[in-house]
């Protein structure tokens, strides 16, 4: 078992992993410590390749463990966001955020000017590149707890408003993220879910799911099976 860490300087990434307790559970592998590799995605509308950490190629299977929550740019972050931005190297993150316009990290201004739907489509396409490479050797778990409207990557996120919902798993990342979105909207406490719903709607968050379906990455229909006792 390895934790995957990306894009910050190696020493900083290692320190953060230790501070958050990851190193006590499993070895941490900083995938882009040795650079990037390209995963082709010919079907892409926005990007024709995904740039991931070169150590990605050392693995023959992955479990994508994601904290489902809001996101200031994507609207929500789940399996697809984690698979795209999470696996991406530093340059790969810029490539996705600029919808294939800029590869080198540096000034983040171009990313802030990217069309929203183009950004969401780029994330879906980067996920597709990872899925094409791994085939059936990948599974997904979304943990729905401490749901803030902001991502964990935000240094000063809004406090979580929604209570824990549960842990969901699937072999289909599209269905998994759709189920999580639906559970947010189905929350009986509308006052606490309102902010996250508004964040997703403002960012047109479901478009990543729409485009993922267009690309054949999964389905938005699902059967939610409860296994808790």
Task: Locate the predicted segments by residue.
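Extended, low-polarity segments enriched in aliphatic/aromatic residues
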Residues: 11-229
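Short, small-residue-biased leader/transition segments that mark boundaries at the very start
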Residues: 1-13
């Amino acid at each position: 078992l390895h934790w995957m860490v990306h894009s910050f300087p190696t020493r900083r990434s290692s320190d953060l992993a230790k501070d958050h307790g990851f190193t006590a559970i499993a070895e941490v592998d900083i995938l882009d410590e040795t650079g990037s590799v390209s995963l082709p995605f010919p079907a892409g509308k926005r990007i024709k390749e995904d740039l991931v950490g070169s150590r990605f190629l050392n693995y023959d299977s992955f479990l994508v463990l994601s904290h489902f929550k809001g996101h200031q740019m994507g609207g929500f972050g789940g399996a697809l966001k984690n698979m795209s931005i999470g696996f991406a190297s530093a340059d790969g993150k810029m490539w996705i955020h600029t919808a294939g316009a800029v590869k080198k990290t540096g000034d983040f201004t171009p990313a802030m000017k990217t069309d929203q739907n183009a950004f969401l489509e780029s994330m879906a396409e980067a996920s597709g590149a990872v899925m094409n490479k791994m085939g059936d050797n990948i599974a997904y778990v979304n943990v729905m707890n401490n749901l803030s409207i902001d991502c964990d990557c935000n240094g000063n996120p809004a406090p979580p408003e929604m209570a824990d919902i549960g842990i969901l798993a699937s072999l289909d990342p599209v269905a998994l993220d759709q189920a999580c979105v639906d559970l947010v909207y189905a929350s009986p406490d509308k006052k606490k879910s309102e902010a996250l719903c508004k964040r997703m709607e403002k960012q047109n968050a479901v478009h990543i799911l729409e485009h993922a379906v267009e690309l054949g990455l999964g389905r938005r229909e699902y059967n939610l099976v409860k296994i808790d006792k």
